[in-house]
Amino acid sequence: MLHLNYDITHLRGAEYNPRFIGEDDLARLAESVRELGLVKPLIVRGDLLVAGHQRTKALRKLGITRAAVYVLPCETTVYDEVRFNQLHNGTDFDSGDERCRVSGLEDKHGFVQVSASQISGNMRAKMAYVRKNIAELVIKYGPWGGCVATQSGEVIHCAQYALAAKMTRTPLTVFVIPDVEKEKYQSYLNKTYGVFEYSHLEKTTYIQTYAQLMRLRNGGSLKSNLYESLSLPIIAKTPRGIDFGSGQGDYARMLRAKGYNLHDLELFRRKGAGNTLDRAATNRMIDTLVDDLKTRGRYDYVICDSVLNSVDSVEAEWSVLTVLKGLCKAGGSIFFSGRSRGELETVLKQTQAASSKSRLYFIDHNGFTALYRKGHWFYQKFHSDDEVKQLCRVHGFRIKRSIFNCKSWYLHVINDDSLSWASLEKAVRFEFELPLPGGSTIGRSDDVLAAFRPLIK
């Protein structure tokens, strides 16, 4: 239910708020609120502020204690509350082709509610997945959002929400402004205040293992593009290799059966298709790694498929790449892959939400997305082409061959000899002491470092 004069003094922010705002942006947002008022309702459940954290900070900075609030009519899930938070901010960014209008506003001012029949617009506008996600929450929880429109009916802010209201045939909350103030409102509303930020959220890295694919089972329909396009045409049976982060290990198992000297290591190997970690298998793989390094040295090539898109922090990304560098001898080959930021842009450009799956991502300034499911945060990392190339420069990788497309990227790089012991030690401590369910850790960093020590000057 919408309340236009709700007491906000008792509201507490959700711990999972995935939005960060610095002091400069907060000051600019406060100026916007002072000049325009609060044009979009906050979203509340009980005394919990579900969405609108930064606007509430701005209101309190200005000493304002009452504001427009939409109170959710029923219990929610944390998953939905996070989606509210993301969409409450995400709807600020319209695609520009909505051509959305609302009739009957000529004598209105401030907040009003209109029927869906008064809304018109381009229902084939871009950002179809934004509308789909908004509509799902509207159907479950009622008309929680709003838009800004002129008295002549032009929607100038949050047009995607207005189109979703028309889709779902639900009432639309509109903040109506005089036509002469359109330019002023747009100058404030089109600015970005704060950024998505997921670094403070809980990390249970072993959860990422649930994304492991059975690559060569079920008819081999999930083959690895990195293996098929870059690795297999180059690696020979004689040199030694290792697949780091091998998931279920299908490719390594298949190639060993064909005579390849290819070890593999997965720190969170699952037992079959279940969700239980096979800690004994992981320890056996680490034992083999330690013995291999001690008796034969570093590897001629290293493969790391779809690991960098599953890291959950900048530190984890650095650690993975540094361990790859340590595993591969100087002059050897490293093959690795990840997901492209272009995939996000492609989704936002789509005019129809054809898939039943949620494909909408809100990316933070480090390239991470976060999805809350089953009590845990799941992360994905997306890279631009330039970011991938910069990672190679930082880690001393010379790109020999690269494949970049709108969804993924794949690299074959040549390793140099610039690795320091201090860097490798830090990375190994991170990777081989990652937490496990129940509060324990992998606990094998000392063994791995002892094997590496004679090999790194």
What kind of feature is each model-predicted range?
Residues M1-I177, E181, Q186-G194:
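Short, charged/polar connector segments at secondary-structure boundaries
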Residues A30, R256, L321-K325:
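A structural alpha-helix within SAM-dependent methyltransferase catalytic domains
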Residues R83, S120-M127, L172-L293, S333-K457:
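Class I (Rossmann-like) S-adenosyl-L-methionine-dependent methyltransferase catalytic domain
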Residues I303-S306:
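A conserved beta-strand element that flanks and buttresses the S-adenosyl-L-methionine
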Residues N309-S313:
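A short His-aromatic
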